[in-house]
Each structure stands twice: as C-alpha cells, then as structure tokens.
Regions:
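Juxtamembrane boundary at the C-terminal end of a transmembrane helix
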Residues: 213-217
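Interfacial loop-to-transmembrane junctions
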Residues: 182-206
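Membrane-embedded alpha-helical segments of transport systems
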Residues: 60-72, 140, 145, 171-177
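Alpha-helical multi-pass membrane helix bundles of inner-membrane/thylakoid proteins
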Residues: 2, 6-16, 88-90, 101-142, ...
Length: 217
C-alpha cells in the first residue's frame, strides 16, 4: 500500500514537472518567435552591438522592458488596453512620429557616411541618451503592446501555470537579446568598412519607415 502511494506521488510529481517544463518551453519559444524578425528594437541592438558600445546596458534594458510587458500581459493589462480605445491610437501616432524621426537620423548617417569601427575616434552618444532612445523605440511602438502584452497575455491564459509561461517568455527575450547584442561583434570585420555601415544605416532607416507606414495602414 505504501509503495503504491509513493508510486502515485512520484507519477503525479513527474506529470506536474512535465507540465511546468512544457509551459515554460512554450513561453520561451513564443517569445523568441515574436522578436526574431528584424524590427526597430532589434536593429538598434544590432547597431550598438557592432559598435561594441553600451552593449550590456542595452541588452538588459531590452530584456527588462520585455519582462515588464510580459508581466503586464499576464496580469491582464491587455484587457485594459482593449477597454481604452484611445490608448492604441495615441501610441500608434506617437510611434509613427518617433520612427520617422529616428529613420531620418539613420538615413542622414547613411548619406554622409564615414562611420566605421574606429574605436574611440568615433563620436559617441551618452549612455543616458542612448537608453532613452531605446526606451522610446520600445514603448512607443504599438506592435510591442499587441504582440507582447495582448498576444502573450491571451495565450498565457490557456495554461494552468501562467508563472512558468511568463518566466519562459522573459528568459526567451533575454536569451535573444544577449545573443544579438554580443554575437553581432562576430560581424565586426565586415563593418570595418565604412560602406558596410552606410548600408546598415540605410537598412535601419528603411526598417523604421516601413514599420511607421504599417502603423498608419
């Protein structure tokens, strides 16, 4: 009898752990799939990763921002956003203006050229201004709220252990940005050529403008 109880407890524990692991991996996979495509935030991280400038603060800011949005989604903020129609509209037009402006900065940089991996010889932006720009790119993009808050929030409701799902999603985001920020330096030999930077700046500008236009459609 005692052996049967132990066996049942072991089986129940195994099923519980299997469920938690599956839920965690589901959140992990969904998070990475949502941020895998190149976007405003990813392009920003890539650019600074190539320059090897403020990489850790940028990566941590992205990961923490995503974690906050994921928690908000799981906590039901998505339903609140749906209840406030003006919220999405305000974020959309604010995001459009900012993305057009940031795209213009990169377009001008691509036009002027002269950027390369020249270390301390380059003029750098302060850490504070860099992080404020990153936060604006992150939180002024309505797609972030639709994907991270609403989508992840609604999908997490399908799982019994929403905490495991949220942890998986947050760690998925952290893993992606760590790999993008620190892995991009492997491309440094290519971007030692100023022409490569002009191409990257042009691609980033086009990416920002495409996202901005898509918000208006």
């Amino acid at each position: 009898m005692r052996a049967d109880k132990i066996s049942n407890l072991t089986l129940a524990r195994s099923k519980f752990l299997d469920g938690v692991v599956f839920t965690y991996l589901s959140g992990f996979g969904l998070s990475i799939s949502l941020i895998l495509a190149i976007g405003a935030q990813n392009a920003f991280v890539l650019k600074y990763g190539l320059r090897r400038e403020y990489v850790l603060p940028i990566v941590l800011t992205c990961a923490i921002s995503d974690a906050i949005l994921i928690i908000a989604g799981i906590a039901g903020f998505g339903a609140l956003a749906h209840a406030l129609p003006w919220f999405e509209t305000a974020m959309r037009y604010g995001g459009v203006l900012f993305l057009f402006w940031y795209g213009l900065q990169n377009a001008l940089s691509a036009w002027r050229g002269g950027s390369a991996l020249e270390g301390e010889a380059d003029v750098t932006t302060s850490l504070r201004k860099t992080l404020l720009t990153l936060l604006a790119i992150t939180f002024l993009n309505p797609h972030v709220y639709l994907d991270t808050v609403v989508l992840i929030g609604s999908i997490s409701a399908q799982y019994e252990d929403r905490l495991a799902f949220g942890i998986g999603a947050a760690l998925g985001s952290f893993t992606f940005f760590i790999c993008l920020g620190f892995g991009s330096r492997l491309l440094s030999p290519i971007f030692a050529n100023p022409a490569a930077w002009r191409v990257l700046d042009a691609i980033i500008a086009l990416t920002m403008w495409v996202i901005a236009i898509s918000l208006l459609l």
